[in-house]
Amino acid sequence: MDILLLLKAFILGIIEGATEFLPISSTGHLIIVGDLLDFNDDKGKVFEIVIQLGAILAVCWEYRSRLISVATTLHTNTSQRFILNLFVAFLPAAIFGLLLHGFIKEHLFSSITVACALIVGGFAILLVENLYAHDKAPAAKASNLNEITPWQALKVGCAQSLAIMPGVSRSGATILGGMIFGLNRKTATEFSFFLAIPVMLAATFYDVYKNFSLFVFEDLAMFAVGFITAFLAALVAIKTLIRYVANHDFKGFAYYRIVLGIIVLAYYW
């Protein structure tokens, strides 16, 4: 058993789980740290699929009561509208993802690209937060998930499509998009969590289909370590972010993105 490989799996599992649902780009962090750990080969790419699945299941577990409630009340308008909103928001990312997935993975998965996206995204967060601080942004209309309209969901889904670029952050794009298009901060954050389920599951199964031959039994221990650490770290991150957004804005994440992006650019240039 390669202890160093398991240590890399542990580190990357924590990074995936801790960053997947924060507006700082988990993919960007995995690319940067993967480069530093020399773990961006085919084995590393397959490993990312496993830890992303761990993070997805953390959302399912945290919101299991809501998911079970929706599944058992499909005949109600509330549940049907919730599913419709997720489907509508999922479509733009699915379309752009299928069209551009291969090109982006081949040409844009680099630390330099991530650094630039981190910096631009950081300033975007500051812009949105400043608009809200000066009451120039649209007033929040949806104070809970049941009040989101399909039109709002579609616009959030379009914002999410920006996250096909590594370093942008899927959660950041959906949360900020939600805030811009009429959701309050907490509702936008929770909708981002739920939207992660179909989006990330679709991406994960697509990657499994494309890379199935790279999964080997000898890597089972590495996969297990990464999966478990990603699951646990994601649970902590989800609970922490929900508490955080009750009384804080996202400017701290913006400054973190900008500083990290500058450091990465300086390191590689």
UniProtKB/Swiss-Prot annotation:
Pfam families: BacA. GO terms for molecular function: undecaprenyl-diphosphatase activity. It is an enzyme of class 3 (hydrolase). It is a multi-pass membrane protein. The chain crosses the membrane at residues 43-63, 82-102, 108-128, 188-208, 222-242, 249-269. It comes from the Bacteria. It catalyses: di-trans,octa-cis-undecaprenyl diphosphate + H2O = di-trans,octa-cis-undecaprenyl phosphate + phosphate + H(+). Keywords: Antibiotic resistance, Cell inner membrane, Cell membrane, Cell shape, Cell wall biogenesis/degradation, Hydrolase, Membrane, Peptidoglycan synthesis, Transmembrane, Transmembrane helix. Coiled coil: none annotated. Its EC number is 3.6.1.27. It is found in: Cell inner membrane. GO terms for cellular component: plasma membrane. GO terms for biological process: cell wall organization; peptidoglycan biosynthetic process; regulation of cell shape; response to antibiotic. Bacitracin is thought to be involved in the inhibition of peptidoglycan synthesis by sequestering undecaprenyl diphosphate, thereby reducing the pool of lipid carrier available. Catalyzes the dephosphorylation of undecaprenyl diphosphate (UPP). Confers resistance to bacitracin. HAMAP family: Undec_diphosphatase (MF_01006). Belongs to the UppP family. This is Undecaprenyl-diphosphatase.
